[in-house]
């Protein structure tokens, strides 16, 4: 629709997806699921909460309400908890499947504040990617889960998406794809 309405390029290398918080999770998930459409993915403070949901299921055998999401919300967003490991809603599953099928994985840019409550989740996902030699630019800088942080990170992310300008990658970890 947008390509026809606005005359956007239909080339994968010209098409990016990004988001923040749960939208960052959604951008990663959609960018991987629709890898034939998106050339790059940018996620700010991505809501990689599947780790907690799957951990809770393994630990307690049930999904419960917590301060961020109640059980019904979790199930509406992510589906049946017992299927999360092998569900297309799980970015790790999508990556594993793409690697098995030798499908090109879009480059990813992940950024997170060092005081963000999702820091460990983002580190875990970056580690997962790194262990599989999936290309990722990952940055941790001072900040928390708010617009002040995201506004500061927007310009470096856009420059990365467009392959333009100089960036301070002193804290970035760029992993080549083998």
Spans of features found by a protein language model:
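Non-catalytic cap/lid and distal C-terminal segments of serine-dependent acyl enzymes
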Residues: 1-178
